[in-house]
Structure formats: structure tokens, C-alpha cells
């Protein structure tokens, strides 16, 4: 039925086909190898450290993978509180200010001041502008500066500052800080 030439051709053709198919995915590699590597795109001139005491310097992980299994990946850097001692020192240099505590959250600065004249609560707009100028001189990324001489706010800010500098967990502290700020500055954006 089949001649010797046909049998010989099919015997030679089958291994040739098998060899050809085996090389088809050369260089493809695995798509789900979870090859994670650290990549640092930080610019030291703009590394969001702002001369403060709370320095969380964590590199971002980058995953070169088609299936990177990211579920509930919050990577929320907005929940960062920093004590701005340099700004507080500059604000305290003002003759109207006896003491200042400043916490920076993102591009917002919250300033609690004890005034030399003993006034508690309201701070004059002129003085607020001077304070804001001093704060922004230490950090060009600050968009809004909120100032209060409310005794309760001053006390809370001192406590928050100590907790941040001591490295207390930020989750509960951030929520508590946010509630306090919303109560003292209800019109803040």
C-alpha cells in the first residue's frame, strides 16, 4: 500500500516536525514568575523628607509580571504625618509667638501656637500670614497652612508630635489627628 519512499519520508518528517515545534516558544519565558525587584526613582532634592523627624524611607516594589496578584493594594502615602521642627523654630522666632508645634500631612501644615500676649483661640489674619510664610519657607510643597491658638488644639498637637517622634503606629494616630483637625478647622479642604 505505502511504498518504501513514503514510509521513509514519514519517518524522517515526524522527528523534524517535533523538533520544529519544540523551539516555537524559545525566549518566551514564564509570564507568572513574580520577578519582584526594588526600583528607586527618588530625587534626593525632592524626596519628601522636609527636614523632619519622622522619616519613613521605603522604596517602592515594582513587579515585572503579567499576573502580579495585587489585591487591595492601597499604597496610600497620604496617611503620613511629620513633625516639622525646623518650621516650628522659625515660627517661634516671631515676637508674637511663644511656642509652636507643627505637623505636616501631605501638602497641609497644621500649626498650634501659644501667643506671647496670652490670647487663646483666634489668631489675627496678619499673624496667620506671617506664620504661613515662615512655614512655607522651610517647605515649598506646603499648599495650605492652618493656624490655631486653641488651648485644646495646642495640647493635642504636642501629644501627637511626641507620639510621631516616638514612632507610635500611625493608623490610629492618623484617624485621631484627622478628627481633631476637622473639628478645629471645619472649613479646611
Swiss-Prot record:
Region (Disordered), start-end ranges: 24-79
Alphabetical GO biological process terms: sporulation resulting in formation of a cellular spore
Presence of the UniProt keyword Signal in the record: yes
Inactivation phenotype: Mutant sporulates normally and has the same resistance to heat and UV radiation than wild-type spores. It exhibits no defect in the initiation of spore germination, but the spore outgrowth is slower than that of wild-type spores. Mutant shows a reduced rate of spore germination in L-alanine.
Superkingdom to which the source organism belongs: Bacteria
Induction remarks: Expression is dependent on sigma G, and to a much lesser extent on sigma F.
Signal peptide stretch: 1-20
Protein keywords: Germination, Lipoprotein, Membrane, Palmitate, Signal
Compositionally skewed regions (Low complexity) per UniProt: 51-70
Any one annotated GO CC term: membrane
Membrane topology per record: Lipid-anchor
Lipid-bearing positions (N-palmitoyl cysteine): 21
Lipidation (S-diacylglycerol cysteine): 21
Record carries keyword Membrane: yes
Main location as per UniProt: membrane
Localization of this protein: Forespore inner membrane
Function: Probably contributes, directly or indirectly, to early events in germination. May play a role in spore outgrowth.
Protein name per the record: Probable spore germination lipoprotein YhcN
Gene designation per UniProt: yhcN
Amino acid at each position: 500500500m505505502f511504498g518504501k519512499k513514503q514510509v521513509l519520508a514519514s519517518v524522517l518528517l515526524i522527528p523534524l516536525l517535533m523538533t520544529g515545534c519544540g523551539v516555537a516558544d524559545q525566549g518566551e519565558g514564564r509570564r507568572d514568575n513574580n520577578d519582584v525587584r526594588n526600583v528607586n526613582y527618588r530625587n534626593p532634592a525632592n524626596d519628601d523628607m522636609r527636614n523632619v523627624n519622622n522619616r519613613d524611607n521605603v522604596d517602592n516594589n515594582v513587579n515585572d509580571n503579567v499576573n502580579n496578584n495585587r489585591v487591595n493594594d492601597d499604597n496610600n502615602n497620604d496617611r503620613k504625618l511629620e513633625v516639622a521642627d525646623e518650621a516650628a523654630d522659625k515660627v517661634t522666632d516671631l515676637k508674637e509667638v511663644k511656642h509652636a508645634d507643627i505637623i505636616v500631612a501631605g501638602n497641609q501644615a497644621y500649626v498650634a501656637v501659644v501667643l506671647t500676649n496670652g490670647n487663646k483661640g483666634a489668631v489675627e489674619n496678619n499673624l496667620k500670614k506671617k506664620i504661613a510664610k515662615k512655614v512655607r519657607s522651610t517647605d515649598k510643597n506646603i499648599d495650605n497652612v492652618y493656624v490655631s491658638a486653641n488651648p485644646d488644639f495646642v495640647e493635642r498637637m504636642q501629644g501627637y508630635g511626641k507620639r510621631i517622634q516616638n514612632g507610635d503606629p500611625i493608623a490610629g494616630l492618623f484617624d485621631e489627628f484627622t478628627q481633631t483637625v476637622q473639628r478645629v478647622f471645619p472649613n479646611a479642604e
